[in-house]
Amino acid sequence: MIFSTLEHILTHISFSIVSIVITIHLITFLVDEIVKLYDSSEKGIIVTFFCITGLLVTRWISSGHFPLSDLYESLIFLSWSFSLIHIIPYFKKNVLILSKITGPSAILTQGFATSGILTEIHQSGILVPALQSEWLIMHVSMMILGYAALLCGSLLSVALLVITFRKNRKLFYKSNGFLNESFFLGENVVENTSFFCAKNYYRSQLIQQLDYWSYRVISLGFTFLTIGILSGAVWANEAWGSYWNWDPKETWAFITWIVFAIYLHTRTNRNLRGPNSAIVASIGFLIIWICYFGVNLLGIGLHSYGSFPSTFN
């Protein structure tokens, strides 16, 4: 009873903080000058991280098993993973570009998990026989950590594509503008060109940072995903007598692995780095959500215990 009450309190606290942080993010998005509000939102995410940690520990103690047995618990752990990835660059101060992605990801995931939409599966139950194994922690935690890192890295790649597209479009319009302007206002061309070059240099630096961090975060996520798939294969052999069954979840996890393996392969070729590899990562972003959420909508296969409740089907 005590753990249930504590879990209920932590859930409401985390949802309240998330709601406040979302409001602050919207305000800072509209008004960039409010620096103190941005700092408050960052601290709010850190407080949310500790609330989620307390929630997971409380649920673990009360249920007697690691809280990764259903969709609700996996969403909470996914939010915790986003928050963990967010905290590291926040304290380093020199990787703020990564925190711009991880912050909103943690906020939205935690907000969805604790909003009441998944009320039917909030209560922890007895594990199904297939999940009563020591491999639960190893397999599922590695998969969720892999999803979190791959999603963050993919979002950085999406941002890279957007900025690159806007940069190329402005380059086209600016070049035409300079040609027209040179016929009428020759003395202003040098000044405008220097301003344009400075702005273009800043964008180029930003694109390089996005490319740098997307590659490293995706590499980390790919490592987690590989460990998760391998440990899952060993667990499947123990539980079902076969390393691989081409279950919908397994199939899409394999597709996800292939897509990001292609991404990492493109990174070995200098000509394919940047926008080309970012396109592959952007495709991977969609594939991950199909693997994590889309397959759950089917509610079939050996991983059906992680599906939505019956009211959603």
UniProtKB/Swiss-Prot annotation:
The chain crosses the membrane at residues 9-29, 44-64, 71-91, 111-131, 143-163, 217-237, 244-264, 278-298. InterPro entries: Cyt_c_assembly, Cyt_c_biogenesis_CcsA, Cyt_c_biogenesis_CcsA/CcmC. It is a multi-pass membrane protein. GO terms for biological process: cytochrome complex assembly. Keywords: Chloroplast, Cytochrome c-type biogenesis, Membrane, Plastid, Thylakoid, Transmembrane, Transmembrane helix. It is found in: Plastid, Chloroplast thylakoid membrane. GO terms for molecular function: heme binding. Pfam families: Cytochrom_C_asm. One of its GO terms (cellular component) is chloroplast thylakoid membrane. It comes from the Eukaryota. Required during biogenesis of c-type cytochromes (cytochrome c6 and cytochrome f) at the step of heme attachment. Belongs to the CcmF/CycK/Ccl1/NrfE/CcsA family. May interact with Ccs1. This is Cytochrome c biogenesis protein CcsA.
